Amino acid sequence: MLDIKRIRNNLDEIKAAMARRGEKDFDLDAVVALDEKRRELLQQVELMKNEQNTVSKEVPKLKKEGKDATEVMARMKELSGKIKELDGQVKEVEDQLEYTLLRIPNVPHPDVPQGETDDDNIEVRKWSEPTHFDFEPKAHWDIATDLGIIDFEAASKITGARFALYKGVGARLERALINFMLDLHIEEHGYTEVLPPFMVNRSSMTGTGQLPKFEEDAFKLPQKDYFLVPTAEVPVTNMHRDEIIEGANLPLSYVAYTPCFRSEAGSAGRDTRGLIRQHQFNKVELVKFVKPEDSYAELEKLTNNAEKVLQLLEIPYRIVRICTGDLGFTAAFKYDIEVWMPSYNRYVEISSCSNFEDFQARRANIRYRPEEKGKVEFLHTLNGSGLAVGRTVAAILENCQDDEGNVKIPEALIPYMRGIKVITK
């Protein structure tokens, strides 16, 4: 959520930032007008309360002097009624203001490239060269089906489209990747492991920005008003909702494995086969709470931590800087890590690493106290996939296949596969 003072004092700047995003869904002038109305009402309430205090002191004084206090008491009653009425108006205006502020996206960082779609994202760097074969590479869903390690038909029968049923070596591969990623981030990168609930409440979804704007994208349990987690970012960030963290303890770095659940409401017809776009998938998530002055340096570290997974698996990838039109609602700046997929003959996103600055912290009321014991401030939050597990399985199947349909296990993963080096029929 944006600071209303920032909008009020830098209205033209915020309008320009929203224009960069291509946002036209709200009227910032109306937001400022609501804020002005709120402040006017609060001023009226304050004046009346001051008068009420003054008048209340006259009553005992008049009674002590034996004078009639009826008129003064009537004024007190009148003021009390007006204050109550104004308090109701203040609450109504504040609710309207919060409703609007919760729907305004984050301001893009000046270094975010201008653009409308993912075609306008800018490549920052590449690691290794794209994998090429002297045979026609198979798509990962065909490899998995032929090897008998993922059964898409059974998953569709059990549930529906966009689900996968892993079995045998396929299930072991998925589990091996989860453990490999967790161990790397905990033991090598210094993250603290968290195993959070897989369901969250409405306040948690609002705190990280999924609600209220994107409720249709979430899986909801209406009987409890709970939501299945779309990403571990939601429960892990909300661990510190309504808390003040000592500055000396920052940064806080967490890693969490969870299944993730997404309706993919806007993805009809896209990636309908395979593991790229599922309603349920596993993911290892990295979340950081940092001081504002450190947040962009910490974003570089987080991105490096995420890409290290692919380096150790020896899978080609690239890093792209996301443009304004592809940035998403909550991020001020974002990198995508895109893995090379031979059957697609292109790079496919496997991780997004974002700096939200104080956007989520304001929504979730997460603050820190500087070491010099100054005024508490909102901290910055970061997160990134480290990595999406199903997409990593897909990348291994496609990049490590041979002309006979077998798949070689990356060297770093063999200890987690109990010595299995090749998946064969």
Curated annotation (Swiss-Prot):
This protein's name: Serine--tRNA ligase
Localization (cell): Cytoplasm
Subunit structure and binding partners: Homodimer. The tRNA molecule binds across the dimer.
Binding site for L-serine: T231, A232, E233, E285, S385
InterPro entries: aa-tRNA-synt_IIb, aa-tRNA-synth_II, aa-tRNA-synth_II/BPL/LPL, Ser-tRNA-ligase_type_1, Ser-tRNA-synth_1_N, SerRS_1_N_sf, SerRS_core, tRNA-bd_arm
Family, per entry: Belongs to the class-II aminoacyl-tRNA synthetase family. Type-1 seryl-tRNA synthetase subfamily.
Role description: Catalyzes the attachment of serine to tRNA(Ser). Is also able to aminoacylate tRNA(Sec) with serine, to form the misacylated tRNA L-seryl-tRNA(Sec), which will be further converted into selenocysteinyl-tRNA(Sec).
Enzyme class: ligase
A Pfam family matched in the record: Seryl_tRNA_N
Listed GO biological process terms: selenocysteine biosynthetic process; seryl-tRNA aminoacylation
Molecular function terms, GO-annotated: ATP binding; catalytic activity, acting on a protein; serine-tRNA ligase activity; transferase activity
Residues bound to ATP: R262, S263, E264, E349, I350, S351, S352
Listed GO CC annotations: cytoplasm
Reactions catalysed: tRNA(Ser) + L-serine + ATP = L-seryl-tRNA(Ser) + AMP + diphosphate + H(+); tRNA(Sec) + L-serine + ATP = L-seryl-tRNA(Sec) + AMP + diphosphate + H(+)
Domain remark text: Consists of two distinct domains, a catalytic core and a N-terminal extension that is involved in tRNA binding.
Entry keyword set: Aminoacyl-tRNA synthetase, ATP-binding, Cytoplasm, Ligase, Nucleotide-binding, Protein biosynthesis
Biochemical pathway: Aminoacyl-tRNA biosynthesis; selenocysteinyl-tRNA(Sec) biosynthesis; L-seryl-tRNA(Sec) from L-serine and tRNA(Sec): step 1/1
Naturally occurring in which organism (per UniProt): Alkaliphilus oremlandii (strain OhILAs) (Clostridium oremlandii (strain OhILAs))
EC number assigned by the record: 6.1.1.11
